[in-house]
């Protein structure tokens, strides 16, 4: 492949503080192949600050060895303390700029090591777990963001996540994160139950309006070569599902779109939103054998 004469930006790391924005461009130069997003070249980081997001990006671009090219930029990384407001500001800015990466996957980063030393592991971690991360264009709604831990020796995906809504940023536990992934059909997913690990490779999630509440049915299938899921574990999954749905609802996220299900059944009338009290939800879990 030809060697590009551009600095190929692979990811943006964006942090907002009291004095404005700090932007780090994770880029490849000059060995990056012009036609491949998996080009082999050292990943470097170029960091700059600015009173505005635009100014911070411009300053960082000026410090690159060659003109910035965002064609292969697929990841947007935010500080772990980021809010939905920050994501929306970034989304609005990128709509009108050459960066224009609204389809980029969004992650939060918990940083305890200098970015310059860990730029390559950070990008690799984002690439490895991209399928479980939302796109930036989804920021207009509530979203659950995966968290990457950037440490001295490595970058690794946390088993916990954060829920970003207009109400704020809410941490989700390991168990709640796994259940949220299951309900969003991001599979396979594993749970630690009854001192054993179960891994579901498939799960059908169905939701029906039932009286004044809802019935949620999870029909799953375990990964081949793993122990059968017991009745006790099914009941634990039911309780965890109920807990996760309620926690998300109370913090502004209707994870299973219960409001839309209600609207389809009753037609006109008062809409059910997360501003209402959490409705009654009956959860059932069943496992299919091979």
Residue ranges and their predicted role:
Residues 1-290:
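Membrane-proximal alpha-helical signals and transmembrane carboxylates
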């Amino acid at each position: 492949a030809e060697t590009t004469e551009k600095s190929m930006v692979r990811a943006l790391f964006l942090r907002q503080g009291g004095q404005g924005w700090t932007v780090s461009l994770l880029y490849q130069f000059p060995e990056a192949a012009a036609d491949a997003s998996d080009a082999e070249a050292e990943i470097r980081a170029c960091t700059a600050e600015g009173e505005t997001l635009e100014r911070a990006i411009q300053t960082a671009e000026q410090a690159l060895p060659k003109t910035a090219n965002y064609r292969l930029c697929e990841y947007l990384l935010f500080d772990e303390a980021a809010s939905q407001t920050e994501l929306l500001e970034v989304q609005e800015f990128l709509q009108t700029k050459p960066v224009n990466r609204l389809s980029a996957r969004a992650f939060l980063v918990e940083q305890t090591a200098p970015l310059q030393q860990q730029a390559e592991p950070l990008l690799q971690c984002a690439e490895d777990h991209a399928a479980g991360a939302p796109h930036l264009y989804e920021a207009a709604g509530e979203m659950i963001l995966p968290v990457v831990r950037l440490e001295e020796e490595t970058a690794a995906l946390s088993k916990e996540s954060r829920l970003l809504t207009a109400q704020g940023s809410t941490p989700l536990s390991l168990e709640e994160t796994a259940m949220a992934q299951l309900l969003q059909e991001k599979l396979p997913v594993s749970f630690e139950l009854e001192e054993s690990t179960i891994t579901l490779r498939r799960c059908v999630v169905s939701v029906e309006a039932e009286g004044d509440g809802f019935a949620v049915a999870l029909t799953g299938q375990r990964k081949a070569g793993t122990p059968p899921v017991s009745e006790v574990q099914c009941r634990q999954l039911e309780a965890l599902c109920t807990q996760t749905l309620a926690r998300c609802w109370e913090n502004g996220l209707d994870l299973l779109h219960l409001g839309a299900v209600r609207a389809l059944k009753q037609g006109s009338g008062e809409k059910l939103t997360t501003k209402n009290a959490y409705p009654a939800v009956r959860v059932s879990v069943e496992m299919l054998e091979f």
